[in-house]
Amino acid sequence: MKKKTIITLVLSFATLLLVLTGCGNSGSKSSSASTKSDSSSTTSGKITAVGSTALQPLVEKAATNFQKKNSKVNITVQGGGSGTGLSQVQDKSVTIGNSDIFAEEKQGIDSKKLTDHKVAVVGMAPVVNKDANVKNLSMEQVKDIFTGKITNWKDVGGKDEKITVVNRAKGSGTRATFEAAVLKGAQAVKSQEQDSNGTVQKIVESTPGAVSYLAFSYINDKVQPISIDNVKPTDENVESDKWKIWSYEHMYTNGKADGATAKFLDYMNSDEVQKSLVKDMGYISIHNMKVQKDSKGTVSSK
């Protein structure tokens, strides 16, 4: 009887140990998962990024992805143009000013107060309504169209149709980049002006004879991109500077970035963004460039 009791006690004790061990292991896994979850959401804060509409789609998508991993960070992305972005980040009314141009190029901006974070490169190209029946122009012809010297598509081998120029607003970095590369100081013809790449794309698509220019990320099969001097507007040609109309995409902060803003900007330069998202959305990674450009527009080999 005693022997049976002892065996029963031993078995009961062993069972108790197994239960306690199981509970202990279960608690460790839960604690580990909890710690991991907590660490992924320790970054918190509110970020407002305003400016370039050329850069806007990339920042919007990156912000969405970043917030999935950092649920305590709230990011608002808006357009308005590069000039607006630079002015507002200088005034500290926004966290980040998105721009297609260097701060040094914008009158009224003290670039010494701002910190430049280059996150991508964007190519830009003339685009026409498909009805114009034009696919290639010389750089001189492009200049003559946007300065008003050429007013009919038949004069450059296209349809007998009046040219309707659609320009960007004066605060646009896309416009500044295009005019620096193409007009080179010449006065643009008076024409309608639009505030965003998206609006321009829709107008060119729907208006017979229309011509404008767009960031590569906005060019689709509903408009006709124009080759210049038989050079196609491609990423590869931008990377080597064979295609001359391109700019860096800047995300400026007022002083040094910190907290959630610094972490988001680090994410913008991560492999996840630079090797995947950038290309998927029609931009060019800053790491793929074989040349570099300064604020004066001087291009040199890297």
Segments (PLM) and residue ranges:
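C-terminal motif of bacterial Sec signal peptides marking the signal peptidase cleavage site
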Residues: 18-22
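Exported/periplasmic ABC-transporter solute-binding proteins
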Residues: 24-70, 74, 80-83, 87-90, ...
